[in-house]
């Protein structure tokens, strides 16, 4: 289950954190960002479904023209995910260059486990245009299945 989501330069959000319980209700005036929060979940789900970075961006209302806050060239979605193996942080950063979205970096680590001494396992998925860095992550398929199931259940 996702227990917290932080949006940086995502659509209309400069830097906002939303805490999530088992029951969540979004309330706000018109144009306050409710749909933009839902778009963030749709984007995470698309990444969890295995879509390429560009395809995941295209699932969001407004596509690449509206996904990053005006005047910025990068956005970040950070989700705290609770699994049977513990709590983890998924930190997804995307950089836009003049030629389009060229780079995604997804870091996954156990909550509170990153130190300067940690060296991540790193691999690049060139078909999806995302580099993955993992820190102290269980290598079991159960963990990865649980993580992707959480993202797909959004």
Over which residues does each language-model region extend?
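Conserved P-loop NTP-binding catalytic core
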Residues: 39-102
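N-terminal pre-Walker A segment at the start of P-loop NTPase domains
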Residues: 1-13
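Hydrophobic anchor at the beta1->P-loop junction of P-loop NTPases
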Residues: 26-28
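Electropositive, glycine-dotted interaction segments
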Residues: 86-154
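A generic structural motif
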Residues: 8, 80-82, 109
């Amino acid at each position: 289950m996702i227990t917290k989501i932080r949006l940086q330069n995502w659509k209309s959000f400069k830097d906002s954190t939303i805490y999530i319980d088992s029951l969540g209700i979004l309330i706000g005036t018109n144009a306050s960002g409710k749909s933009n929060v839902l778009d963030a979940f749709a984007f995470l789900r698309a990444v969890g479904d295995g879509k390429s970075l560009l395809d995941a961006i295209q699932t969001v209302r407004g596509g690449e023209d509206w996904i990053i806050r005006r005047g910025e060239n990068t956005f970040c979605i950070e989700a705290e995910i609770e699994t049977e193996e513990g709590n983890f942080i998924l930190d997804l950063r995307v950089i836009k260059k003049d030629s389009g979205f060229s780079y995604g970096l997804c870091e996954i680590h156990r909550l509170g486990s990153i130190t300067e001494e940690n060296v991540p396992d790193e691999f690049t998925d060139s078909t999806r245009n995302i580099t993955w860095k993992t820190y102290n992550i269980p290598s079991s398929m159960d963990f990865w299945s649980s993580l992707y199931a959480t993202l797909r259940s959004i």
